[in-house]
Amino acid sequence: VSDRLIIFTRYPEAGKAKTRLIPALGAEAAAELHRQMTEYTLAQVKRLQQSLSLTVEIWFAGGDRIQMQTWLGSDLSYQPQPEGDLGDRMAQAFQTAFDNGVKAAIIIGTDCPELTDVLLTEAFQALQQTDLVLGPATDGGYYLIGLRRSVPELFKTIAWSTDRVFQQTVDIASNLNLSLATLPALTDVDRPDDLPVWERTITPSSVL
């Protein structure tokens, strides 16, 4: 059974998507940004699939399966996100993957345009030798988490949406004696100050 990449995203409905950017951009533009960032992430994933044997699952919030398929295509697998906090939902996504017999699974969001197919490849390669791989975000969270087996303890007692998420996860992993590989620190585009990261990503650097 191949490796699995799980993408957490939501249907780009105005007022529900990228809410922390609404004061700066307005609800419609924030939802449009979310749509573009999700499509950009999927373009990286499609490049990854050319070199790795991979199943891709979209775990979505908002909208329904038909709306998601119409938006992102029917060649992907869609799963509505369950109830619970982010930790509960990620723990369940990993449990489902390992119940299906996958060897390694990675969860990403769609907020990190600097996450390339090259880094995703590096993360899957790290999981051949390592229990846990994390991609630290500059806001103290993480943009990627990968495992070789279900470890629900990694998602309990975490102060989600704070700058302590990455460090708390590392501490739990250490207590569980899990081996850890970390990727380069990247920026999630969540707040108005982060928007230049997205603009740099989609604007090819001009040759002076």
Residue ranges of model-derived segments:
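Short beta-strand/loop segment that forms part of the nucleotide-sugar
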Residues: L54-G62
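N-terminal nucleotide-binding beta1-loop-alpha1 segment
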Residues: V1-L21
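Short aromatic-hydrophobic micro-motifs that form the base-stacking/packing surface
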Residues: I106-I108
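Short, glycine-/small-residue-rich phosphate/pyrophosphate-handling segment
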Residues: V151-I172
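A short, N-terminal amphipathic alpha-helix
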Residues: H34-S51
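Conserved alpha/beta core of the MobA/IspD/sugar-nucleotide pyrophosphorylase nucleotidyltransferase superfamily
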Residues: Q167-L208
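Conserved donor-nucleotide/metal-binding helix-loop-beta segment in metal-dependent transferases, i.e.
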Residues: L115-D139
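Short phosphate-binding loop-to-helix
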Residues: M68-A104, T162
